[in-house]
Amino acid sequence: MPVVKGGVWTNIEDEVLRAAVSKYGLNQWARVSSLLARKTPKQCKARWVEWLDPGIRKVEWSREEDEKLLHLAKLMPTQWRTIAPIVGRTATQCLERYQKLLDEAEARENDELGLGGPGTEASAPSADDVRRLRPGELDPDPESKPARPDTIDLDEDEKEMLSEARARLANTQGKKAKRKARERQLEESRRLAVLQKRRELKNAGINIKIVTRKPGEMDYNADIPFEKPAAPGFYDTTEEEARNERQREMFDPRKQQLANKRKGDQDEEAERKKRKNDKNSNSAAFAAAARAGQMQKIREAEQSSKRRALVLPTPQVSESEMEDIIKMGMAGDKASKMVGDEEGTKGLLGNYSAMVGGTPIRTPRAPPEEDHIANEIRNIRALTETQSSLLGGENTPLHDGGSSTGFDGIAPRRQQIVTPNPMATPFRQGNAVSATPVPGGAGPGATPLRTPRDHFSLNKEISGGLPIGSTPREIKMRENLARQSIRGRLAALPKPKETEWELEQLPSESAEPAGATEYPEEDSAVRDAREKEIRKRAAEAEHKRQTQVYQRSLPRPVVLDIDALMERASRVMDPITGLIAKEAALLVANDACKFATPGAKIEGKPRKLERLDDKYLEEARAAIASEASSGKLEEWSNEFDAKWSSSRQDTLPGLSNYLDDDEEDAYQQEQRIIGVFDNVQASLLATAEDGNKLEKKLALHYGGYQNRAKMLRAKITEAHTALEKSKHELDAFRTLQISEEAAISRRLEKLREEVAFVMRREREAQEQYRCRKDELDDLVASTGGMVNGWH
């Protein structure tokens, strides 16, 4: 009959599971479950994860944990396996706590609405009653429940399981233990052999990787089991160090030893009395159970959370404000002392330092805070009970904003705790009640708040001395009341007398517009396009203001001496031509400096170029165009071509340079040829010098690269030579391998023949020996044991 495994866990099974986990670890659940006859590997693992793991927190849930649980349930609905490690609990604990919070909220709402009924007999069953198991039902999740106490009389199966577990867990000298020890020694020798082999291969230049971890298992030599890495970041340990120092100073080793001794004596005395009273019971079992109980208490004490530090709200009255209040009080006292006994001035000063002693001062009530947990539960219930979105209608109203945990991140939104500051708005606390209201505001009221005394009734009170409300609705009502009061007082003024007044007629003024026209906000894309168009037009206008040389991208001077250029322009005698030359020199210098070409050498300080208006530039261009359209341009062009041709014919080397004999004598021709030769020679020398300079410059810049190229070329040659040598060696060794393989077969055949010959001779010798032995035995038998007369 198959055995159905599962059910409630007992205390014995828990202890066996703990011992098995301590021996086999957290990765061999099949071996662990072999010690428990009624549990499967999955159930053993679930029991450890859900209940027996020392890292599980079983203390009461705090308010922060409830708030975080509801916030994460809102962000990740039904993902309890993901929520559990964030909250610090198990998935089952999170689910049960979540359901309990919803049930408590529902019960609270029913009590508020009066749905509880007249008595418990008429009320509906609670959530705990619904979830409580009825007789005959099985717990669907027994791994997360406390263990059942052990019975006095154990079943035969339980006794057999317990004895087998004791034998297997306590066996360290039996056959299996010895076999395990031999296996460990073999494994160690195998590991050392692998290390030796790896060391030899490494010395030979071959690196291999040792993989000792089996697939699906943990390498306990390389990894750390049960490791819980700390969160990254730096933490301030000043407070912890100070607390440790205080505890170390308060610790007295003598008192501690005395207390431990007394405690040990008391425990031993109680244990002795217990053993004496219970003689029939198994003392060893009770001692083990007692030790297990003590260890459980120690573990629970370690799991309990530390006492949290006191978190005080930030004060609203800062040090500077406190100093200002003190200075104000000192200034009032100083003014009172300066007045002295003058009654006229003394009546204008009030004493604001003295407080009314007979009135008890209450602590101002802090503003009410939103209950995030209750709001989140209401939101969850509203979303659960809402109708389908297919039916239409309005959305479910939820608590958003500051009244909920929000969706800012994985952690819920925190409320900023502040203390009320009555000094910030004196006499205007909407949540305060006057202890001794004075009707009509005739004098200062003795309020429980720390408000200054109002001797001159500057702060008027409303409704019998109650402080003025600070809500928007009350402020609006107060303003409307003040307006009505002013209108009533103005209406109560006497009517004006009937008197005619003659006023001078004032000049008419243009009517002001009734209100400023509101323009719609301009789109950012339209604004960017408009600004881009404006910048483009400004750039085009600036481009047109430049010279034609820059506009047409004509070459500009590379080597220029501005001072020499300006001096040459100033030497022109004709005033009109001089002005033109100066302006041209300024334009050339400005273009050379402002739009310099790469590698240009400009000497001298550039002169400031006067910026002309666009109107004048257009007029000048129109005048030049009109002048160019006339016949003078053609005449000037012809004259320029003629002079250019004549100048080029006289300077260019060629046949055109040499005139006829009747026009020029031989001496002048010789001198011209000599001059041309000198010019060509000078040009060649200059070109050679420039080439040498350029060669030096290139050698300076690229000398390192050339050396590097030479070195790499040499290395490549060496590598090629080594490669060729290696190829030759490889071919030689391959030839040797082929010849060796052929020779090996021949040698093996020869050795086999020799072995066969030796074996054949050995068989023949054995056969001959056997024959001789038989002959000797027959001879001895025939002679009766006498050979040569001897027995």
Swiss-Prot record:
Belongs to the CEF1 family. Residues 1-56, 57-106 form the HTH myb-type domain. It comes from Emericella nidulans (strain FGSC A4 / ATCC 38163 / CBS 112.46 / NRRL 194 / M139). The keyword Aminoacyl-tRNA synthetase does not apply. Residues 128-151, 240-255 have a biased composition (Basic and acidic residues). The keyword Nucleus applies. This is Pre-mRNA-splicing factor cef1. SMART domains: SANT (SM00717). Residues 110-188, 225-318, 390-471, 494-526 are annotated as: Disordered. Signal peptide: none annotated. Its main location: cytoplasm. Involved in pre-mRNA splicing and cell cycle control.
